[in-house]
């Protein structure tokens, strides 16, 4: 199969994959495309969110400092992205991202991009780097605390344990 993905993995993973019509609707109506910057930012920032970010940092200071130093990304940027994308990991999405990526691959608008993402994700599953049973995230196929797309994860990725959000 494509990308040297085993037939076994493909069959196992894609058996429950389905077309999600709502994903196409979400793709056509993204706030980043119709809200001006001021509106977009004001809807996603508040004193409450800032305080939640401070608490998250204080509770995870050692790990965040390791990530900041290892990847040379300021902790303030990391925390800001995490706050916007997942409210500090409290909402990482509920969509089956395999079905989301398959749906967006089928749709002609950005088929090439999403097909590539789907194939990368299948390869990561095939190599046992990601458990396909835990792949829930955004309608666009992003997942985790930072809502990364599969292409942002490489074969030589660094595993760091993040806190759970029970």
Show which residues each predicted segment covers.
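A very general structural signal that marks isolated residues within well-ordered alpha-helical segments
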Residues: 87, 164-165
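Acidic/His-rich structured neighborhood in mature extracellular/periplasmic domains
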Residues: 42-157
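An acidic, Gly/Ser/Thr/Pro-rich helix-cap/linker signature
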Residues: 1-68
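Conserved small/polar residues in nucleotide/adenosyl-binding loops
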Residues: 158-164
């Amino acid at each position: 199969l494509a990308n040297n993905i085993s037939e076994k993995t493909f069959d196992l993973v894609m058996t429950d994959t389905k077309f999600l019509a709502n994903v196409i609707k979400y793709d056509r109506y993204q706030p980043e495309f119709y809200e001006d910057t001021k509106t977009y930012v004001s809807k996603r920032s508040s004193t409450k969110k800032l305080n939640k970010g401070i608490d998250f940092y204080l509770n995870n200071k050692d790990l965040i400092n390791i990530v900041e130093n290892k990847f040379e990304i300021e902790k303030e940027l990391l925390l800001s992205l995490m706050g916007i994308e997942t409210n500090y990991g409290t909402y990482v999405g509920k969509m089956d991202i395999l079905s989301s990526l398959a749906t967006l691959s089928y749709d002609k608008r950005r088929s090439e991009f999403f097909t590539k993402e789907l194939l990368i994700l299948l390869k990561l599953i095939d190599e046992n780097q990601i458990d396909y049973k835990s792949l829930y995230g955004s309608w666009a196929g992003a997942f985790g605390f930072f809502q990364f797309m599969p292409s942002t994860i490489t074969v030589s990725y660094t595993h760091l344990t993040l806190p759970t959000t029970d």
